[in-house]
């Protein structure tokens, strides 16, 4: 789960992290009122969407030379003008795709006199089971280019959660940022505060870009992104309350109601699989055969008729889907139960696109018999490779 920048900053402030003053706004009038409450005379107007690259983004409805989603205003009047241009319009960034995201809220912050920009993030390193702090002296809008062109400018400090954050970790962060004296102490303190928040809130990712050094010698968190482990949200009702469903794909929201893991992609072949690893392998082999998956959909280990029907409905809501590949390995789930669910779901949704089904595992023959006797044009497959070839052929035949 993701939250907006202003929400992330409110959470971090509870852990003592220094952030510039700022107020969220849903209307032009609220943006103007927010600016009037800030010291000024400089203000920053920020579009609030769940995507990075806002500063370099472009609004679909505005001229090509118009400014992006993060703008410096030198007066209250400019704040008003920027708010009018941004609210309700579609911001396209490197992370949104061509469709972009509509800007429904803004964050108006006090201007900061910046001397230097740094980068700091924390992620769960799944390979080691530890928290990795990633830092760079090259913070700002071009951090992706830095990571690609000059990876030596990025340093990683790994923390064993059993040990926790120790003073030497803080010093390592400061040294990696080439800081000394009071600034090094500030960096160490901020890193510790961020780590405490990261662990306490069950974050999966926390990114500060940029962490800025001001002209008067202070370190401030200027922009932040936070993502949370969805499996731990039951422990954080305060975080769940921050969820903005308008920023999420409606199909993904619907899928979550049935405990389905669904992610929309840009292809034309819908996938329904049990198990994340098998789902990724299925998507890979579809691409290997020349087409592209329309989604990632893991029905999990306890799929029933209701879940399978919901999965079909969610897949078919995507108009780009021209065929569906079902790939099920029956371990805990029995293939005959899944087959019954597939047949019932296909009848209920009046399936009109090609459907290829590959079953393997417990009660596989019973499952295949149910599909064969269903009276539906379901194409059986013997293995994963056969399934991929058949669904690609079926989709191309009706194209």
UniProtKB/Swiss-Prot annotation:
InterPro entries according to UniProt: ATP-grasp, ATP-grasp_succ-CoA_synth-type, ATP_grasp_subdomain_1, Succ-CoA_synthase_bsu_CS, SUCC_ACL_C, Succ_CoA_ligase-like_bsu, Succinyl-CoA_synth-like
Keyword Transmembrane appears in the UniProt entry: no
Binding sites annotated in the UniProt record for ATP: 46, 53-55, 112, 117
Protein name: Succinate--CoA ligase [ADP-forming] subunit beta
Keywords: ATP-binding, Ligase, Magnesium, Metal-binding, Nucleotide-binding, Tricarboxylic acid cycle
Enzyme Commission number: 6.2.1.5
Signal sequence segment: none
Domain of life: Bacteria
């Amino acid at each position: 789960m993701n939250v907006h920048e202003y929400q992330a900053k409110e959470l971090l402030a509870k852990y003592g992290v220094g952030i510039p003053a700022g107020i969220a706004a849903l209307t032009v009038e609220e943006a103007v009122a927010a600016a009037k409450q800030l010291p000024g005379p400089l203000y920053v107007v920020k579009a609030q969407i769940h995507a990075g690259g806002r500063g370099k983004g472009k609004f679909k409805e505005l001229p090509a030379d118009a400014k992006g989603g993060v703008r410096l205003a030198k007066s209250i009047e400019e704040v008003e003008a920027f708010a009018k241009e941004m609210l309700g319009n579609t911001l396209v960034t490197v992370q949104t795709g061509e469709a972009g995201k509509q800007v429904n809220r803004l964050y108006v912050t006090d201007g900061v006199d910046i001397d230097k920009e740094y980068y700091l993030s924390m992620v769960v390193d799944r390979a080691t089971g530890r928290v990795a702090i990633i830092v760079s002296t090259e913070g700002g809008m071009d951090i992706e280019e830095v990571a690609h062109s000059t990876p030596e400018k990025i340093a990683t400090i790994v923390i064993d959660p059993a040990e926790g954050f120790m003073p030497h970790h803080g010093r390592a962060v400061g040294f990696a940022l080439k800081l000394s004296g009071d600034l090094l102490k500030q960096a160490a303190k901020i890193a510790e505060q961020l780590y405490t928040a990261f662990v306490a809130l069950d974050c999966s990712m926390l990114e500060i870009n940029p962490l800025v050094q001001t002209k008067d010698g202070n370190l401030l968190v200027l922009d932040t992104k936070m993502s949370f482990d969805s499996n731990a949200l039951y422990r954080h009702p305060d975080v769940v309350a921050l969820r903005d469903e308008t920023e999420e794909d409606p199909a993904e929201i619907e899928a979550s109601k049935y405990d389905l893991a669904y992610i929309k992609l840009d292809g034309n072949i819908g996938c329904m699989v049990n198990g994340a690893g098998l789902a990724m392998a299925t998507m890979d082999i579809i691409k290997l055969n020349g087409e592209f998956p329309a989604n990632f959909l893991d029905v999990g280990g306890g799929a029933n008729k209701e879940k399978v029907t919901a999965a079909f409905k969610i897949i078919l809501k995507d108009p780009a889907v021209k065929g569906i590949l079902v790939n099920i390995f029956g371990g805990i789930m029995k293939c005959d139960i899944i087959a019954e669910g597939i047949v019932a779901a296909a009848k209920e949704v009046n399936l009109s696109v090609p459907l290829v089904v590959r079953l393997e595992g417990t009660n596989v023959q019973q499952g295949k018999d149910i599909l064969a006797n269903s009276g539906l044009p379901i194409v059986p497959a013997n293995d994963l490779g056969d399934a991929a070839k058949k669904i690609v052929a079926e989709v191309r035949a009706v194209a």
